[in-house]
Amino acid sequence: MGQRDDRFHVEVSVGARVVEVRATGEIDVATVGALRSALWAVPARSVLRLDLSGVGVLSAAGVRALAAAHLRLRAGGGELVLVRPDPVVARVLRVTGLHRVVRVIDDAPAPVAGRTLIAA
């Protein structure tokens, strides 16, 4: 499940309690809808690990989407974890202060048993 365009791609792997989302490309006003769709498809009670290692651009629209996803997941008993952000993206997270409210880790994602749904 998800969306694909020439500048952005998202893959989702669903496990029993953890959902892995891998984003690749640019997250900006033109592509944030695809990211938002993938994030909102995840049950709020889940731990959502968003791998940002393939993202080179994170605009204000992307930051807003991440903040909203964090609030939605937290309200449902879940958690958003940002994994391996590119150095440019990590800087955006620090400058905006999002790193203070959303956990950011440098670990490689653990494999998730389950199915993988790929954006088209």
What are the residue ranges of the model-derived segments?
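STAS-like cytosolic regulatory interaction modules
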Residues: 1-57, 68-120
